[in-house]
Amino acid sequence: KMMLARFYHLDATAEEPPYAGRTPVFLVMADHAGGRTANYHGTTVLTQVLRGMWPGLSDSLEEHGQYVVRPVAINDAEHFEQLVDELDYGPYKVAGFLHELVLMNYGAIKLTAEFVARTHALCKDHDIPILVDEIQSCIWSPEIFLFREYACRPDFVSAGKGFPGGEYA
């Protein structure tokens, strides 16, 4: 919601959002086939659409310029940069980059430090908020949050299920 607030009014009394009139684009981690099934950020309709579920809804949202979702090849900073160059101008604006540091629902693939550093620097240069999803990678890091080991400073961190460190009563 915070990312969409830069594009759409919350209510009639709100000020004009900075990117009103542009189509928000969400960048998420791709699966090996270039699809969106590797990213998982929850079970809300929005996060399910980010993952490629509800394809009819996703197609309609894109067709009507409400928002667009594009997958980024795993650990491919050049692909990320290409998408930013293509989708962060004119009628489009990259609304956010959402990713796990370890794709736990896709074989526990770890993002490289180089990929994270380069993509996060591009995001900073282009006013693109970053959400690091630590839902399943929390607590087993000596730094509590794995993003600290990557020396990155995301705008948003999703935390939760991993806090018990795999120990459940």
Predicted segments with their positions:
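Surface-exposed amphipathic alpha-helices with a cationic face
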Residues: 116-124
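Conserved residues at the C-terminal ends of beta-strands
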Residues: 29, 100, 160
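Short acidic, glycine/serine/threonine-rich loops at helix termini
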Residues: 1, 37-43, 107-109, 140-145, ...
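Active-site PLP attachment segment
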Residues: 151-169
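Proline-centered loop/turn at the N-terminus of a beta-strand
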Residues: 25, 127-129, 155
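PLP-dependent aspartate aminotransferase-fold enzymes
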Residues: 1-96
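Conserved PLP phosphate-binding loop immediately N-terminal to the Schiff-base lysine helix
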Residues: 100-112, 128-150
